[in-house]
Regions:
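N-terminal alpha/beta PP-like core and its mobile active-site loop of ThDP/TPP-dependent enzymes
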Residues: 1-266, 296
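Active-site diphosphate/adenylate-binding microenvironment
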Residues: 5-9, 13-18, 23-26, 270-330
Length: 330
């Protein structure tokens, strides 16, 4: 006989889950939710028949889980249905754009006999932006107004960035990235996309002359904190905001449709040339640390930027470095 835990592991392996780790905290789950990272979060609980006694460590796990896993929270009710629950949770986690799916696993469901591994469940296939949306945005671009494309989420990967760079080369739109992208591919040979500044005063300057802002898997920018006498919403009052593609849609297909609509499909994208900032000298400063990273980093480096204000110059200093991935705060 196979118990619930054994059948669960077989289901996870068959679904392509390759990394499992034990974790007692929740802060990274908050980051995963904000970053739209596909995570299956399995939380142990008391045996189903023990819950009614309200033991010392009993808690309402579903309520706590919804804070970081609003799209999918489920408590497994039996060993026989556990693996189907798990397969559906994995599909939910993988649904575009990605989310934390929480499966609560009571002890007796885990140790009970009769577990049956389940086949993987395919997540829904994302759809591109509809024709009416694409045509409305194409018309806005053709108007000649100062236009910026604000990119976020999964749009900051090479295929979508190249598509956006074609649009920029053809139509003169400005490319901007959200302040703290989950992951952005950068470096020589890729389009350079300027990140929106962390400080609201600087972000406001970047957006000052923008008359039309097109959102690509991104939200309209707001300040990180409220300040007396200053606006929280950073988009200029006279700027029109258009959403090309929402996080749960097909980003690349939507950008390609827009390029077709404005005639940018064959445009040659502008790419970042290779350039190192030079080896820093003198007294150690945050800027010189950023410069050293840009000078010495090898190809395919993964930068995990937790410097916040100390890393303000990091994007500039690494722009022409060999190709790399940058992961930021979410």
């Amino acid at each position: 006989m196979t118990n619930g835990a054994q059948a669960l592991m077989k289901t996870l392996v068959d679904a392509g889950v390759e990394v499992c780790f034990s974790n007692p905290g929740t802060s990274e789950m908050h980051n995963a939710r904000k970053g739209k990272v596909p995570v299956l979060n399995i939380v142990g609980d008391h045996a189903t028949y023990h819950v009614k006694y309200d033991a010392q460590l009993q808690s309402d796990i579903e309520t706590v889980a919804r804070n970081v896993s609003p799209g999918f929270v489920r408590t497994a009710k039996s060993t026989e249905t556990l693996c189907q629950d798990a397969a559906e949770a994995i599909a939910a986690a993988r649904s575009a754009p990605g989310q934390v799916a929480t499966l609560i696993l009571p002890a007796d469901v885990s140790w009970g006999e009769g577990g049956v591994p389940s086949a993987p469940v395919a997540p829904p296939t994302p759809e591109p932006a509809d024709d009416a949306t694409v045509e409305a945005i194409a018309k806005a671009i053709r108007s000649g107004k100062k236009t910026a494309l604000l990119m976020g989420g999964h749009s900051l990967r090479e295929p979508s960035m190249l598509a956006a760079a074609k649009l920029a080369a053809h139509s003169g739109v400005t490319l901007l990235a959200e302040t703290f992208p989950t992951r952005i591919q950068r470096g020589a040979g890729l389009p350079y996309i300027e990140r929106l500044a962390y400080l609201a005063e600087l972000a406001t300057v970047q957006l000052t002359d923008v008359e039309q802002l097109i959102l690509v898997d991104a939200k309209a920018p707001v300040s990180f904190f409220a300040y007396p006498g200053k606006k929280s919403y950073l988009v200029p009052d006279t700027c029109q905001v258009h959403t090309l593609v929402a996080p749960d849609q097909d980003i690349l297909a939507s950008l390609n449709k827009l390029n077709d609509a404005v005639g940018a499909s064959q445009a040659k994208p502008k790419l970042q040339p290779a350039k190192r900032p030079g080896r820093p000298r003198g007294k150690l400063t945050a800027e010189k640390v950023c410069k050293a990273v840009g000078e010495l980093m090898p190809e395919n480096t993964i930068i995990v930027d937790e410097g916040i204000t100390s890393s303000l110059m990091l994007s500039v200093m690494t722009a022409g470095a060999p190709r790399h991935d940058m992961i930021t705060l979410t």
